[in-house]
Amino acid sequence: MKKAILGKKLGMTQIFNENGRVIPVTVIEAGPCVVVQKKTEEKDGYKSIQIGFGDIREKLVNKPLKGHFAKSGVSLKRFLKEFKVDNIDEYEVGQEIKADIFAEGDRIDVSGISKGKGFQGVIRRWNAQRGPMSHGSKFHRAVGSMGASSDPSRTFKNKKMPGHMGNKNTTVLNLQVAKVIPEKNIILIKGGVPGPNKSFVSIKDTVKA
């Protein structure tokens, strides 16, 4: 992996391409991020950089993290994430990473925490089939069979059941950068990305390239 940045999802809009077609895009405030830590093969066993994004009040940061930032000489950041990189020599602690590291047409993977939907049944959560709705049926939106009888006398793990839907780490692969506005730290990405507005996302080169 060569490039990565952190950002905040601002919402969705639409733009027009050169043929006049409407393209739905997600607006991301990408950076400026700062390199908080470098990890090397000799010291840590692998090569990576830790970058931070978004200012935060001092009272909201615990003592270990304050020491971590003080050691790097970097101001406190709200969102920290580590990325494995091949070209670690190109980065230094305190270096800024801005939106212009990406260009129009780049293929990227975007990770974030999906929107929480609360407690949902199997029809919405797992797209299960509904039961008969006619008179006489008592089975409409229920779970249905959860396993066999006396053997094995239990419900297997990972059975698709009602439960908390969403609010999980989600990655959308192979999206395309529609436009970069470096002076405003804005990246427009074709299509949707995980999470509600104002949520944090990470953007990196796609693994599918």
Swiss-Prot record:
UniProt region (Disordered), positions on chain: 130-154
Biological processes, Gene Ontology terms: translation
Keyword Ribonucleoprotein: yes
Gene3D superfamilies named in the record: 3.30.160.810, Translation factors
Sequence intervals crossing the membrane: none
UniProt keyword list: Ribonucleoprotein, Ribosomal protein, RNA-binding, rRNA-binding
Keyword Disulfide bond on entry: no
Family annotation (Pfam families): Ribosomal_L3
InterPro entries assigned to the protein according to its UniProt record, in alphabetical order: Ribosomal_uL3 (IPR000597), Ribosomal_uL3_bac/org-type (IPR019927), Ribosomal_uL3_CS (IPR019926), Transl_B-barrel_sf (IPR009000)
GO molecular function, a single term: rRNA binding
Cellular component aspect of the GO annotation: cytosolic large ribosomal subunit
HAMAP family, alphabetized: Ribosomal_uL3_B
Similarity comment text for this entry: Belongs to the universal ribosomal protein uL3 family.
PANTHER family on file: 50S RIBOSOMAL PROTEIN L3, LARGE RIBOSOMAL SUBUNIT PROTEIN UL3C
Protein role: One of the primary rRNA binding proteins, it binds directly near the 3'-end of the 23S rRNA, where it nucleates assembly of the 50S subunit.
Subunit organization: Part of the 50S ribosomal subunit. Forms a cluster with proteins L14 and L19.
Protein name: Large ribosomal subunit protein uL3
Organism: Clostridium kluyveri (strain ATCC 8527 / DSM 555 / NBRC 12016 / NCIMB 10680 / K1)
